[in-house]
């Protein structure tokens, strides 16, 4: 029991005892002086207390004794009652409005995540915001309204840059015009927009290719590969490591060719029939000593092992770049994550629901590069904007170690991370229970929308906490006298504040917030299309959606055409003439030692002419639109 409540109880019983003592003392004096039948004057003692102490000291000693005994009896009674109290177990309770205000959950929208509302959407109750905790884990099964109740409301209000995985593209359609009107530069990356092909481009290798230190380039390529290339089983991790070595060597060769793209890495690793001969030629071509050594090692590896390396490299994520659309979407970058804290950017990575799993390597690469860029340095004075990152369908993206590792430190880099998953078991399957618990703990706030699977129901009930329930048992013995033998017993028992049965029956509009080091919160989810605050923001949007312009698409396609024409022209020149590639100062000394390299092996002229014709047709279609 709270110490302040104990003190208040003791004081209350002491005052009651003193009042009773005063009444008895007044009656004693009246009956002693005026007889038993006299009317009691309760003010007599108060009026003449000082004089009576002088004139009637013996009587006043009795008065003091009566008042003292009654006061002591009151204190003793309070102690007895408190000792007689039933055992208390947990004391968890739902946060009150005053507690939430004190804990920083009520305030102006735009700073931190908006989590829910204290009342129905159409009502005037306050919104619940997370200012103290920068990250959130949202557990929401399909159809629970995580998009309308969490993602869209935050995109409509967040003041800063935003990067969101937009499954189905509805977030772009609902919020991009508002964010553009607020001054954000809006980008829509949609590699699988088969219908219109309207997509901005993003190339994660440009950041690495721009590094001056070639040793750091190698390390960054290896880190990048481990972030997005994943095997289905840990038993083949050794083979995947060999594939990653091949990826790194191909990346360094692509940098030397001045074509730093994942598509080029795919072509380097996959081209050629006899892989041993092919990689021997690549070893002769590349000037980087580390890449040369890797290619030579691959050339001396037996064919079965080499095939396993390459096969696992492709199935782990690189094969997606065999698709021309994916290759085009990553050939260059229309935006730079290094600028995301300097000027507000809104980047929507749009993927159709059925494409989330096949596109998981690109999605992992996209967000891993974002997190790595943010953590390159702490924000300076010229980087005032925070960054909101929303990872929807997190359980379908495969393992992202950089998320579990960086969520502990992202706060100091001015980033707010929201992870959305459907169930707890889905996370356990990928990360394991211990890593999942660490992820939950570092999130600070866990937002649950009516769970459906048993593991999540059990997890939520336990996470909310325990409370104490008073149980009264009545019994009677059967006999002739129905009023005889009756008894009543009272006890307390520990129970969940939110029992599992109640979790199963939660209203679909209810949400539960589990907060680190605080009492839980029960509230209502937001419906932006019904809430007056959000509906007003949404309805103010006007104009066309900020899709990539035809001019932007034509500029990118023209660049590809020029590159194709240059390759075709180069193939028509005598193969004996070879231009020395430009190299950094670190490589100049190594160039002389690498003499005797054979001409670069490239695809046929017909293949490039066919590709150029396809690009021309696409360009003509874009120009007509």
Regions found by a protein language model. Give the residues of each.
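Short beta-strand-to-coil "C-cap" segments at the C-terminal boundary of structured domains/repeats
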Residues: 118-119, 525-529
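Conserved ATP-driven motor cores of ASCE-family P-loop NTPases powering translocation/secretion/packaging/pilus
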Residues: 407-409, 413-512
């Amino acid at each position: 029991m709270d110490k302040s409540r104990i003190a208040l109880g003791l004081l209350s019983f002491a005052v009651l005892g003193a009042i009773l003592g005063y009444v008895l003392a007044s009656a004693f004096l009246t009956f002693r002086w005026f007889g038993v039948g006299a009317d009691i004057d309760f003010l007599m003692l108060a009026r003449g207390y000082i004089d009576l102490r002088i004139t009637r000291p013996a009587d006043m000693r009795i008065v003091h004794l009566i008042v003292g005994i009654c006061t002591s009896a009151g204190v003793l009674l309070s102690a007895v009652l408190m000792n007689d109290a039933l055992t208390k177990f947990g004391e968890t309770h739902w946060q009150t409005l005053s507690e939430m205000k004190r804990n920083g959950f009520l305030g102006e929208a735009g700073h931190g995540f908006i989590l829910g509302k204290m009342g129905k959407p159409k009502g005037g109750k306050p919104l619940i915001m997370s200012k103290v905790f920068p990250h959130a884990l949202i557990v929401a099964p399909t159809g629970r309204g995580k998009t309308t109740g969490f993602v869209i409301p935050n995109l409509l209000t967040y003041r800063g840059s935003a990067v969101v995985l937009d499954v189905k593209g509805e977030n772009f359609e609902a919020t991009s015009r508002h964010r553009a009107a607020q001054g954000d530069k809006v980008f829509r990356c949609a590699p699988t927009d088969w219908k219109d092909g309207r997509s901005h481009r993003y190339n994660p290798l440009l950041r690495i290719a721009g590094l001056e230190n070639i040793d750091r380039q190698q390390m960054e390529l290896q880190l990048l590969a481990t972030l997005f290339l994943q095997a289905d089983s840990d038993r083949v991790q050794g083979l995947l490591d060999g594939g990653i070595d091949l990826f790194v060597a191909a990346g360094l060769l692509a940098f030397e060719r001045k074509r730093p793209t994942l598509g080029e890495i795919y072509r380097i690793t996959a081209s050629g029939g006899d892989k041993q001969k092919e990689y021997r030629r690549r070893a002769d071509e590349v000037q980087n000593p580390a890449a040369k050594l890797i290619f030579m090692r691959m050339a001396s590896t037996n064919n079965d092992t080499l095939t396993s390396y390459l096969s696992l490299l492709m199935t782990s994520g690189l094969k997606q770049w065999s698709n021309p659309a994916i290759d085009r979407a990553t050939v260059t970058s229309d935006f730079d994550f290094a600028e995301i804290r300097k000027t507000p950017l809104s980047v929507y990575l749009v993927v159709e629901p059925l494409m989330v799993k096949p596109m998981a390597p690109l999605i992992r690469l996209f967000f891993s590069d974002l997190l790595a860029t943010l953590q390159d340095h702490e924000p300076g004075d010229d980087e005032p904007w925070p960054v909101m990152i929303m990872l929807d369908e997190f359980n379908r993206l495969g393992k992202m170690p950089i998320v579990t590792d960086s969520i502990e430190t992202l706060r100091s880099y001015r980033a707010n991370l929201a992870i959305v998953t459907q169930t707890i078991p889905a996370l356990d399957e990928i990360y394991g229970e211990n890593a999942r618990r660490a992820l939950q703990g570092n999130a600070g706030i866990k937002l649950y929308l009516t769970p459906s699977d048993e593991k999540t129901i059990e997890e939520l009930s336990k996470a909310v906490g325990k409370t104490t329930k008073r149980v009264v048992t009545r019994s009677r013995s059967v006999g002739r006298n129905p009023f005889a033998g009756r008894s009543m017993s009272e006890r307390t028992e520990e129970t969940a504040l939110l029992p599992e049965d109640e979790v199963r029956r939660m209203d679909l509009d209810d949400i539960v917030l589990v907060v680190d080091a605080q009492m839980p919160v029960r509230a209502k989810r937001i419906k932006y299309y019904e809430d007056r605050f959000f509906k007003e923001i949404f309805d103010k949007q006007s104009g066309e959606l900020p899709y990539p312009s035809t001019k932007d698409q034509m500029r990118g396609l023209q660049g590809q055409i020029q590159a194709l024409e240059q390759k075709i022209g180069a193939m028509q020149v005598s193969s004996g003439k070879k231009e020395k590639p430009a190299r950094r100062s670190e490589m100049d000394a190594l160039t002389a030692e690498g003499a005797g390299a054979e001409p670069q092996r490239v695809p046929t002229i017909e293949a490039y002419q066919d590709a150029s014709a396809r690009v021309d047709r696409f360009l003509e279609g874009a120009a007509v639109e």
